[in-house]
């Protein structure tokens, strides 16, 4: 007992020293923490002061910069206003000057016109009436003649066309029959060649599939038999293991129950001894602590008094701070309310002004646009009027000149009496005519040269434009093809990569799973072994302790041991009987369970099999659906793209037409406006951008700086709080250990305080949230009100504007009607004047020009007739071509359907084979999976057996050790006298024996582990060899199959390539034949042209000789007819002149009255218009100045409000930061005080408790010890419970506080983000406005350039096309003329011969023959001379025609060569890309097959073949679509060309008729 007491004393001294050391360390830490916090706060205060000084400096500098910027802006605005005023003044002065000049010129012209108008009218009206009557009668006669001739020609034309069509139809049917026979022969030959290999391939495939199915079936049968055997074996083993396991569990539970009872009894005895020792130790500790507590009480009292005084001072301080904060809050609230009211008022004013300015701007823009449109319309009308005036001036000049000539003519007429004067005037007239004809010839030569030069230039431009268009089209087609190929490659790559990644992930997952399973098994084994070792060591320790305690009390327990042995014996006998009964019951239960489990397993297997079949069927269905969906989606995509392309083309055409119309209207006005405003806008934009960017960068820098400072402060605060929180946690842990009692009281107070704070925060937060909502609602209502008012104002302005616009439109319509009526009257007057002049002039040269006109009319009529014939021929050709194309497309579609059918049969065959393969692979996988499961089960079984043996060995060892302990205890009881010596010796012996046994166990385990490893290695070798054999066999099978598939694929590829080559060869052959035909046709045409020219020359010579004779006869007849016509004509002329004079006088009177009334109206309108223009200009200037002033004021208000808002935001941020810092600082102080108070309170309670314990200890020591233990446990439990109860609300409050702070920070962030967004949006709007202006100017310029380029290209194409049409029409007319000449010549010769034969008798035949021979001999020289001249003329004509045709041919051949080259390059590039793509795909597939050959090589190869097949099918389909698209494009171009040709012909006819009318009007 003395030794124990000394030990306890020693340990108590150590504890006291440790406690004092901990107290000292904690106090030192507190002082250190206090000093550090004071230093930190002081440094933060200094930093804050420096930041405030910097902010004040920055604020003053920014105010100075703002003031300077405002002054500069004001100066700039004043200068801009001055510049605009000067420009307006200059423009108005120039406009007024221009108007004055125009008005003066108009007045002069009008006065001159009025002076000469009345003099002219009478004569002109008379002559016009005469000429109109003449022309009308002539026109009627010509019309009747034309109708008759056209009807005759149309009948001839249709009959000839019918004959030609019939002949061509017969030729076409013959060719078609021959082609069909050739195709049938070729197909038969091809089918005959392919029949044998296809049949052989089918037989081989059937045999191969049969063999594969047989092998699979036999393998499956063997595997299923083996699996069934293994499963049954496994079931029997499981039954046996369950029985064995149950027996072992029952044994262990029974033994554990017996051992637990023994341990419980011993534990109760040791517990009572330990309680006695604890009570003694606590009494000693209490006595020692009393002296220490007395000294500490004095210190605590002094600390407590200081704490109380400090607390009172702090409470007063807190109250004053709170009062100050409330007062400040009220002041700031008042300021904020006042500022808010002012801000809202400013915002309302600003928004209203802004909206008014916006509406004003919109109205001004609309007004400007209306003014612009009005100006444009007025300008257009003025230009139109000027043109009309110019025409009127020209007509007046012509009338004036004509009047002069008329006067001259009248003078000459008066001098008819004098013959000499008349003769001289006649000679002068003849000379003038000759001069005029010379001048005309020279002018026509110059015009021809100039037009030729222009045409050559146009041809050059057209060729350049055609080259550009071709290059652009080729580039586009190549890009489209490349993109389509690239997309298909990307799709294939994605599919392949997805498949590859899936396979890699699967393999990795399986490897990881195996590794995890092995690691888990190893880890669990290690864990179990570790646990066993721990249990073994714990058992050893418990045994040693138990033996030490048992050695003292062994004698007492011998009786109880004997009784226990007897009880155990009886219990063992009863337990044995129960065990036997239990085993029998268990055996019967297990049999029933095994039967039931077998039944359930069979049911599950059947269900799994059915489920697998259903899943496979659904999977196949899914695969088919997926393929069908892909095909459907592809078809829909193609349709969609085609329709989109078609609609896009139509829309593009419409857009181009509308754009061209709009651009022609806009370009005139915009050109003038843009050039004026671009300079001013550029300069203004540059200055504004530079200033704005500088301002923006400064603003951003200030914002970033302020945000960085706030973030730094926030981050430092967080760091400080984290550090303080860590220190607080450390202090809290130490305080919990020392001050358990005081904490409860302090925690309650702290919780009350926190509860008050939380309620205060909640109230503030609740106040803040509705306030924010109220502000948002108020802002929204203000915005809605402003918008609504603006909308109403806009509506009113819109209504006013519409009224004004309606009135303006009515006025404009009336004015335009008046103007149009005036112009029509003027035109009518001018037309009557022109007609009178024309009739007067035509009286002199009417007869001579009638002849020329009839010739031209005949030529035109023949040309029209030939054109109609050619058009009908073209229509027939077109219909035949369309029919041939339809037949060819049908044949192509049939071929494609056949290929698709063959491909579908192949796909179905392959797919069925693939499905059979998949079924086999699924069965194979299930078999492998069952094998793996079975092997894993065997391994787990062996492992469980090993663990059971290990557990059994441990139990045997433990039972053996128990027996040994009991034996040793008996020996120890006998040797009670020599307890210490024998016990020590026995302990050493036992330790040695335990080590020996442990070493034996370790050796056994090691040997067992080694044997297991050897068995595992042997099994792995066998498995590896089996796997290698299986892999080799499978590889051999797959290689064979791959070879067969490879050869079949090569065969298919070769056949398919040969088919493609054949098709390409046929297409190239057709193209070559087509080109050859064209070339031969051109050569034949040239040859025929030469022949025709020769014949034409001969016909011309014959016609000239014939016409000479006919002209002599006609002249005589015409001379007689002319005398009669002149007499009748003179009589008719005198009758008509009287009527025309009468009508003319009436018309002149009417025109003069209307002219006087219109003149008065015009003068009134011009005066009103001038006054309105002056008023508008003054009003616009005034309004512009007002707008500028308002904008300037609004900008100043916005800047001031924005700066105020910025300063207010900064102030709020600083206020928020200071509040957070103050709250943190106060919370830290409160925590520190609370900790000090808890320490003092605990020390007091400890002193009181120790003092009470010392007083009561003398009376009842044993009772007090037990009561202290109970009280201690109860108090600890209660305190813990109370602490946990209080901790939950504190934690919830802390969380809420954290959430509130987070919400506050989020609100601040939201405000900042909203403000930044507002800034960014405003900047973007400004930028967007500037960009839209620049874009509009740029687009206008670009559209103008684009329109000009398009216009030039279209003009070039039109010219080129017109040339081509002209040459074609000339050629066709030439051929028709050639035929007609031949027919005429043949008829003429026949007629001549028949006449001669009739007239000449037989007797004179010899003389005629002699004379003809002499005549032939004489005329031979003349013929040769004429022929040589004709040949020269023909050569010259041929050379000119050949030059034109060669140029055209060369251009066409170049274009054809370039198209062919491009097509060949495209085909070669296509083939190369296809080859590259196929090679890449094959390489990827080979790599994949090579990597996965062991797993599923056959499946991969089949997939590759199917992929290739699908890819080729897709490629052929795509090629077919491309060819089809190209054919459609060519057809469209050809149709457009033909329609353009027709339009050109119509245009030429109209143009020729217009030229004839103009020539007639002009008198040439």
Curated annotation (Swiss-Prot):
The gene is ASPM. SUPFAM superfamilies: P-loop containing nucleoside triphosphate hydrolases. GO terms for biological process: cell division. It comes from Ateles geoffroyi. Probable role in mitotic spindle regulation and coordination of mitotic processes. May have a preferential role in regulating neurogenesis. Its main location: cytoplasm. This is Abnormal spindle-like microcephaly-associated protein homolog. The keyword Nucleus applies. Keywords: Calmodulin-binding, Cell cycle, Cell division, Cytoplasm, Mitosis, Nucleus, Repeat. One of its GO terms (molecular function) is calmodulin binding. It is found in: Cytoplasm; Nucleus. Residues 31-60, 220-251, 270-299, 293-322, 366-395, 389-420, 439-468, 462-491, 512-541, 535-566, 608-639, 658-687, 681-712, 731-762, 754-785, 804-835, 827-856, 877-908, 900-931, 949-980, 972-1003, 1022-1053, 1045-1076, 1095-1126, 1168-1199, 1304-1333, 1327-1358, 1377-1406, 1452-1483, 1474-1503, 1500-1531 form the IQ domain. InterPro entries: CellDiv_DevSignal_Domain, IQ_motif_EF-hand-BS, P-loop_NTPase. Gene3D superfamilies: 1.20.5.190.
């Amino acid at each position: 007992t003395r030794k124990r007491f000394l030990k306890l004393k020693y340990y108590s001294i150590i504890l006291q020293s440790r406690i004092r050391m901990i107290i000292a360390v904690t106090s030192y830490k507190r002082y250190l923490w206090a000093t550090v916090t004071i230093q930190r706060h002081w440094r933060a205060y200094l930093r804050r002061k420096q930041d405030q000084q910097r902010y004040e400096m920055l604020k003053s500098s920014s105010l100075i910069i703002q003031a300077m910027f405002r002054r500069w802006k004001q100066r700039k605005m004043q200068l801009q206003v001055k510049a605009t005023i000067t420009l307006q003044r200059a423009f108005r002065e120039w406009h007024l000057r221009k108007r004055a000049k125009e008005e003066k010129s108009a007045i002069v012209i009008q006065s001159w016109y009025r002076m000469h108008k009345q003099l002219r009218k009478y004569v002109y009206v008379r002559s016009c009436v005469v000429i109109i009557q003449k022309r009308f009668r002539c026109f009627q006669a010509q019309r009747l003649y034309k109708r008759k001739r056209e009807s005759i020609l149309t009948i001839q034309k249709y009959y000839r066309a019918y004959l030609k069509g019939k002949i061509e139809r017969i030729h076409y049917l013959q060719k078609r029959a021959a082609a069909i026979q050739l195709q049938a022969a070729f197909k038969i030959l091809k089918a005959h060649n392919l029949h044998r290999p296809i049949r052989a391939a089918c037989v081989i495939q059937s045999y191969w599939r049969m063999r594969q199915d047989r092998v699979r079936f036999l393998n499956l049968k063997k595997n299923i038999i083996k699996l069934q055997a293994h499963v049954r074996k496994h079931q029997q083993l499981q039954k046996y293991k369950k029985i064995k396991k149950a027996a072992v569990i029952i044994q262990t539970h029974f033994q554990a129950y017996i051992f637990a009872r023994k341990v419980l009894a011993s534990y109760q005895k040791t517990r009572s001894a330990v309680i006695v020792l604890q009570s003694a130790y606590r009494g000693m500790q209490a006595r020692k602590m009393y002296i220490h507590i007395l000294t500490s009480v004095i210190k605590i009292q002094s600390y407590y008094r200081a704490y109380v005084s400090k607390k009172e001072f702090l409470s007063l301080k807190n109250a004053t701070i709170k009062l100050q904060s409330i007062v400040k809050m009220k002041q700031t609230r008042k300021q904020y309310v006042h500022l808010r009211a002012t801000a809202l008022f400013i915002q309302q004013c600003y928004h209203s002004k802004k909206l008014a300015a916006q509406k004003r701007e919109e109205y001004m823009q609309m007004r400007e646009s209306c003014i612009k449109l009005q100006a444009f319309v007025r300008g257009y009308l003025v230009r139109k009027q000027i043109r009309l005036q110019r025409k009127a001036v020209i007509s007046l000049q012509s009338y004036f000149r004509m009047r002069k000539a008329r006067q001259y003519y009248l003078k000459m007429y008066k001098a008819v009496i004098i013959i000499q004067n008349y003769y001289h005037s006649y000679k002068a007239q003849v000379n003038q005519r000759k001069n005029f004809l010379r001048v005309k010839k020279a002018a026509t030569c110059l015009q021809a040269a100039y037009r030729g030069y222009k045409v050559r230039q146009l041809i050059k431009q057209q060729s350049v434009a055609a080259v550009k268009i071709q290059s652009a089209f080729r580039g586009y087609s190549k890009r489209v093809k490349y993109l389509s190929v690239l997309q298909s490659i990307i799709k294939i790559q994605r599919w392949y990569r997805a498949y590859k990644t899936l396979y890699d992930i699967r393999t990795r997952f399986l490897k990881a799973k195996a590794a995890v399973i092995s690691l888990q098994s190893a880890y669990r084994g290690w864990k179990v072994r570790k646990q066993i070792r721990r249990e073994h060591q714990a058992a050893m320790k418990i045994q040693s302790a138990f033996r030490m305690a048992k050695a003292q009390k062994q004698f007492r327990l011998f009786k109880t041991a004997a009784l226990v042995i007897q009880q155990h014996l009886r219990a063992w006998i009863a337990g044995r009987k129960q065990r036997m009964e239990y085993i029998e019951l268990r055996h019967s239960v297990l049999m029933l369970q095994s039967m039931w489990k077998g039944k359930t397993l069979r049911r599950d297997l059947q269900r799994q099999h059915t489920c697998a079949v259903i899943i496979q069927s659904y999977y196949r269905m899914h695969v088919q659906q997926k393929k069908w969906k892909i095909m459907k989606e592809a078809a829909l995509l193609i349709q969609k793209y085609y329709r989109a392309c078609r609609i896009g083309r139509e829309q593009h055409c419409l857009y181009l037409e509308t754009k061209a119309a709009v651009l022609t209207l806009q370009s005139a006005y915009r050109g003038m406006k843009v050039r004026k405003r671009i300079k001013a806008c550029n300069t203004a934009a540059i200055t504004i951008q530079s200033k704005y960017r500088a301002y923006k960068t400064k603003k951003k820098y200030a914002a970033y700086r302020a945000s960085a400072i706030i973030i730094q402060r926030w981050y430092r605060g967080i760091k400080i709080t984290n550090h303080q929180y860590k220190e607080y946690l450390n202090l809290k842990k130490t305080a919990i250990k020392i001050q358990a009692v005081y904490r409860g009281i302090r925690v309650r107070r702290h919780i009350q305080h926190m509860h008050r704070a939380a309620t205060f925060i909640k109230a503030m937060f609740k106040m803040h949230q509705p306030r924010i909502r109220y502000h948002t609602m108020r802002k929204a209502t203000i915005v809605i009100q402003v918008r609504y008012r603006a909308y109403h104002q806009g509506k009113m302005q819109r209504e006013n504007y519409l009224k004004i616009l309606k009135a303006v439109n009515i006025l404009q319509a009336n004015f335009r009607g008046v103007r149009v009526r005036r112009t029509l009257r003027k035109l009518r007057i001018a037309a009557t004047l022109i007609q009178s002049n024309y009739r007067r002039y035509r009286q002199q040269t009417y007869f001579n020009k009638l002849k020329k006109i009839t010739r031209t009319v005949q030529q035109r009529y023949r040309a029209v007739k030939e054109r109609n014939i050619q058009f009908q021929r073209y229509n027939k050709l077109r219909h035949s071509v369309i029919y041939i194309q339809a037949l060819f497309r049908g044949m192509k579609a049939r071929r494609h359907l056949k290929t698709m059918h063959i491909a579908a049969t192949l796909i179905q065959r392959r797919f069925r084979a693939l499905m059979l393969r998949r079924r086999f692979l699924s069965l194979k996988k299930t078999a492998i999976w069952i094998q793996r499961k079975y092997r894993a089960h065997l391994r787990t079984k062996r492992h469980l057996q090993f663990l059971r043996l290990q557990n059994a060995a441990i139990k045997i060892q433990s039972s053996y050790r128990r027996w040994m302990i009991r034996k040793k205890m008996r020996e120890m009881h006998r040797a009670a006298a020599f307890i210490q010596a024998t016990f020590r010796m026995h302990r050493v012996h036992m330790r040695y024996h335990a080590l020996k046994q442990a070493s034996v166990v370790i050796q056994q385990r090691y040997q067992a582990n080694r044997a297991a490893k050897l068995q595992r290695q042997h099994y792995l070798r066998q498995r590896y060899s089996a796997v290698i054999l299986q892999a080799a066999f499978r590889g051999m099978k797959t290689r064979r199959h791959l070879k067969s598939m490879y050869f079949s694929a090569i065969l298919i590829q070769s056949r398919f390539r040969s088919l493609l080559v054949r098709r390409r060869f046929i297409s190239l052959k057709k193209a070559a034949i087509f080109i050859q035909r064209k070339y031969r046709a051109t050569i034949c045409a040239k040859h025929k042209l030469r022949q025709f020219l020769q014949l034409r020359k001969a016909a011309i010579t014959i016609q000239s000789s014939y016409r000479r004779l006919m002209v002599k006869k006609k002249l005589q007849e015409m001379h007689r007819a002319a005398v009669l016509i002149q007499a009748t004509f003179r009589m008719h002329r005198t009758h008509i002149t009287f009527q025309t004079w009468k009508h003319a006088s009436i018309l002149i009177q009417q025109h003069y009255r209307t002219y006087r009334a219109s003149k008065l109206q015009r003068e009134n309108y011009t005066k009103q218009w001038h006054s309105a223009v002056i008023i508008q200009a003054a009003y616009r200037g005034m309004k512009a100045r007002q707008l500028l002033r308002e904008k300037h004021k609004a900008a100043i208000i916005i800047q001031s409000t924005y700066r105020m808002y910025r300063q207010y935001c900064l102030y709020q941020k600083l206020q928020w930061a200071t509040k957070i810092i103050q709250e943190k600082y106060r919370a830290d102080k409160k925590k520190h005080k609370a900790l000090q108070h808890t320490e003092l309170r605990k020390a007091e309670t400890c002193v009181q408790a120790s003092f009470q314990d010392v007083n009561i200890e003398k009376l009842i020591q044993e009772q007090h010890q037990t009561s202290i233990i109970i009280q201690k446990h109860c108090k600890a439990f209660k305190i813990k419970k109370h602490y946990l109860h209080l901790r939950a609300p504190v934690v919830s409050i802390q969380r809420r506080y954290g959430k509130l702070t987070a919400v506050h920070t989020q609100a601040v962030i939201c405000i900042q983000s909203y403000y930044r967004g507002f800034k960014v949006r405003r900047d973007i709007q400004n930028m967007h406005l500037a960009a839209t202006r620049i874009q509009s100017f740029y687009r206008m310029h670009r559209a103008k350039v684009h329109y000009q380029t398009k216009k030039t290209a279209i003009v070039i194409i039109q010219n080129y096309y017109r040339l081509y049409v002209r040459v074609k029409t000339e050629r066709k007319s030439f051929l028709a003329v050639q035929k007609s000449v031949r027919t005429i010549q043949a008829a003429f010769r026949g007629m001549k011969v028949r006449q001669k034969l009739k007239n000449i008798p037989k007797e004179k035949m010899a003389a005629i023959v002699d004379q003809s021979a002499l005549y032939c001999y004489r005329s031979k020289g003349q013929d040769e001379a004429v022929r040589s001249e004709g040949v020269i003329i023909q050569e010259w004509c041929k050379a000119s025609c050949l030059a034109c045709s060669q140029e055209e041919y060369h251009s066409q051949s170049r274009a054809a060569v370039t198209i062919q080259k491009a097509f060949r390059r495209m085909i070669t590039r296509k083939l190369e890309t296809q080859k590259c793509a196929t090679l890449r795909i094959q390489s990827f597939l080979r790599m994949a097959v090579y990597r996965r050959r062991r797993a599923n090589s056959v499946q991969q190869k089949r997939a590759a073949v199917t992929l290739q097949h699908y890819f080729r099918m897709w490629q052929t389909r795509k090629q077919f679509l491309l060819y089809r698209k190209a054919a459609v494009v060519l057809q469209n171009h050809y149709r457009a060309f033909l329609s353009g040709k027709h339009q050109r012909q119509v245009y030429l006819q109209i143009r020729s008729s217009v030229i004839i009318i103009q020539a007639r009007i002009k008198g040439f």
